[in-house]
Amino acid sequence: GKVAVVTGCDTGLGQGMALGLAQAGCDIVGINIVEPTETIKQVTALGRRFLSLTADLRKIDGIPALLDRAVAEFGHIDILVNNAGLIRREDALEFSEKDWDDVMNLNIKSVFFMSQAAAKHFIAQGNGGKIINIASMLSFQGGIRVPSYTASKSGVMGVTRLMANEWAKHNINVNAIAPGYMATNNTQQLRADEQRSAELLDRI
């Protein structure tokens, strides 16, 4: 009977996490920049409900209303998965302010303000809650040619620890997952680069 809010669940990891939560018995609130048609189909096929909300999370003003809508629909929320993210690739010497801001606004700024809004609901509900943030192995390794992505995912690790420290007294668990390279839309350009793809595969 739990309700999980999952951002960026149209494809890839986010879609997989939404389906996994649905298989575990959760109803899903999906927040995406496009309608996640295939995810909705698969979640509802499992007998779970799916509330689809469309938003550009780089604009944080609308975040409280999104979670208010989720609570209005289901009566409560229990889990937040902050998965929505993007990546821009360019040498650090040539990296633009727009590519910096777009990535930072979605990958770290929205993570904090989504978590803040969810935590307020968790506290008001009195039952605690779970927040799962998606970091990256680049939070630790740095990587190359993705300066704003690396900065944002390093920030995700930092604020995850901070929120866990502050909100433990409210029975809110805050954790981060740091995946390696996965076959998703975000890594399509990387996998298409034969040299970089070979370098990564050689590590296995």
Q: At which residue positions do the language-model features occur?
A:
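Conserved glycine-rich cofactor-binding loop
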Residues: V3, D10-G12
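Conserved glycine-rich Rossmann-like NAD(P)H-binding loop of the short-chain dehydrogenase/reductase
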Residues: A24-E38
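Active-site loop-to-helix junction immediately N-terminal to the catalytic Tyr of the SDR YXXXK motif
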Residues: E90, F95, Q141-T150, L162, ...
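Substrate-binding pocket helix/loop in short-chain dehydrogenase/reductase
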Residues: D91-A92, S96-M104, R196, L200
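Active-site helix of classical SDR
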Residues: S115, S152, T160
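Alpha-helical segment proximal to the catalytic Tyr-Lys
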Residues: K120, N165-K169
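Residue(s) in the substrate-gating loop at a strand-loop-helix junction
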Residues: S136
